[in-house]
From Swiss-Prot:
Gene Ontology cellular-component terms listed: cytoplasm
Protein name per the record: Histidine ammonia-lyase
Keywords per UniProt: Cytoplasm, Histidine metabolism, Lyase
Taxonomic source organism: Burkholderia multivorans (strain ATCC 17616 / 249)
Family label: Belongs to the PAL/histidase family.
EC number: 4.3.1.3
Cross-link 5-imidazolinone (Ala-Gly) placement: A141-G143
Reactions catalysed according to its record: L-histidine = trans-urocanate + NH4(+)
GO biological process: L-histidine catabolic process to glutamate and formamide; L-histidine catabolic process to glutamate and formate
Encoding gene per record: hutH
PANTHER family referenced in this protein's UniProt entry, alphabetically: HISTIDINE AMMONIA-LYASE (PTHR10362)
Length: 506
């Protein structure tokens, strides 16, 4: 059970919510603020004075006053009319994060929503009844309206859910969770819909996947150093201290630890080769830059995870209702775009190491890593697959945040495209996962072909690979080998061997 303290979520909590079947409860210390916000909205509605989002229309229709007897209908219509998403359902892990983030935002007491509504979301979450949310349809301002409308519609008994993974109607989902359809009161529909929780949830979910890939890439890169008989001298701490970038220093330390005690490395320490190619030698510089970007993105996303991104905002202590733009997801878009650059570069560098290993003139290994070349093609086309995926990632890494299209009759004339920025991270991560799987197979093949042993830490990695895929002797149906190693990548079977850990794993 995780106790959500609104405004104080941590990265380890968020990773746990996304990855583990934990249940949620709300910190009772937040109840007074939630109740005060709800009362403030009720008082404003009773007075009848125009207040945006409480008794007016929305967007371009904000100047339209809504009579008191139509306020509940206004909220219902808002939810139903905004539930216009298309595409595949959002991943289960992202939906779990989305609900947790929405609860945190609402729980800070500036949205004017009743605890009854929040309790319903918690009951759905804990019963493993998750709204079916189409993943496409948000431009990241005014908040993630369409995705959050699909979440909210379930509370009204409209739409679809997944009950313990099985697709069902919202009515059935409410029944399983022990709930009846809700009637939303003034501002509650808007409070549920307005916010950056969909884009932030998608970005966080993919951040955690990319963190796992990063650690796997450090392991794969170290194994490739031994497979190519590369030098460990470029990882000397003194080099990296002189430059001073934290990520570079940390990455170099990981490579040193992974390669410590390698007999392969000791066997060629005094050879005549002066410098390795950049894909081996500059790993700390490239992977360090990726690490710095990822850490910055994590910091931004954690701030956003704890933010109140509703509009308008209620200040119960003064009774004020302030309209602003906290729903604009530009920080999330920038963070996701930076993550895309890092994830694509992780895959691009791995692809270059695969190319090095299969090139006999660079690696000193048999061409395409197979002894009887000619009749056997070995890793020739596996590298082509890696190249195709790396190239695709370069297109996917184009920043979504540089685009904007005006919506709502030009009232919402600049938007962030944060949801697409966050969503396409999943495709980049999937491509990078497969590139790393190919590199791990190629590097293991290269280490097998060396006379000496790799380091003790990397020997454990070799055991993991060889427990699933045998040494490549003759050409065979290769795709299943890549698939089984890619599955191990997702299961963090290689990441666990990395001496480095992220803040979300603490």
């Amino acid at each position: 059970m995780i106790t959500l303290t609104p405004g104080h979520l941590t990265l380890p909590q968020l990773r746990q919510i996304a990855r583990e079947p934990v249940q949620l409860t709300l910190d009772p210390a937040s109840f007074a603020k939630i109740d005060a916000g709800a009362k403030a909205v009720s008082d404003i509605a009773a007075k009848g004075e125009p207040a945006y989002g409480i008794n007016t229309g929305f967007g371009r229709l904000a100047s339209t006053h809504i009579p008191h007897d139509q306020l509940e209908l206004l909220q219902k219509n808002l939810v139903l009319s905004h539930a216009v998403g298309v595409g595949e359902p959002m991943a289960r892990s992202s939906v779990r994060l989305l609900i947790a983030l929405k609860l945190s935002s609402l729980g800070r007491g500036h949205s004017g929503i009743r605890r009854e509504v929040m309790d319903a979301l918690i009951k759905l979450f804990n019963a493993d009844v998750l709204p079916l949310i189409p993943v496409k349809g948000s431009v990241g301002a005014s908040g993630d309206l369409a995705p959050l409308a699909h979440m909210s519609a379930v509370l009204l008994g409209v739409g679809e859910v997944f009950i313990r993974g099985e697709r069902a109607s919202a009515v059935d989902g409410l029944r399983v969770a022990g709930l009846a359809p809700l009637t939303l009161q003034a501002k509650e529909g808007l409070a549920l819909l307005n916010g950056t929780q969909a884009s932030t949830a998608l970005a966080l979910d993919n951040l955690f996947a990319i963190e796992d890939l990063y650690r796997t890439a450090l392991v794969a890169g170290a194994l490739s150093v031994d497979a190519a008989a590369g030098s460990v001298k470029p990882f000397d701490a003194r080099i990296h201290e002189l430059r001073g970038h934290r990520g570079q220093i940390d990455a170099a330390a990981a490579y040193r630890e992974l390669l410590e005690g390698s007999a392969i490395n000791l066997s060629h320490r005094d050879c005549g080769k002066v410098q390795d190619p950049y894909s081996l030698r500059c790993q700390p510089q490239v992977m360090g830059a990726c690490l710095d970007q990822m850490r910055h993105a994590a910091d931004v996303l954690l701030v956003e995870a704890n933010a109140v991104s509703d509009n308008p905002l209620i200040f119960p202590d003064t009774g004020e209702v302030l309209s602003g733009g906290n729903f604009h997801a530009e920080p999330v878009a920038f963070a996701a775009d930076n993550l895309a650059l890092a994830a694509a570069e992780i895959g691009a560098l791995a692809e270059r190491r695969i190319a090095l290993l299969i090139d006999a003139t660079l690696s000193g290994l048999p061409p395409f890593l197979v002894k009887d070349g000619g009749v056997n093609s070995g890793f020739m086309i596996a590298h082509v697959t890696a190249a195709a995926l790396a190239s695709e990632n370069k297109t996917l890494a184009h920043p979504a945040s540089v685009d904007s299209l005006p919506t709502s009759a030009n009232q919402e004339d600049h938007v962030s495209m944060a949801t697409f920025a966050a969503r396409k991270l999943a495709d980049i991560a999937d491509n990078t996962k497969h590139i790393l799987a190919i590199e791990l197979l190629a590097a293991a093949q290269g280490v097998d072909l060396r006379e000496n042993e790799t380091s003790p830490k990397l020997a454990e990695v070799m055991k993991t690979i060889r427990s699933k895929v045998a040494h490549y002797e003759l050409d065979h149906y290769f795709a299943p080998d890549i698939a089984v190693i890619a599955k191990l990548v997702v299961e963090r079977a290689f990441a666990k061997h990395c001496p480095f850990a992220f803040a979300s794993e603490q």
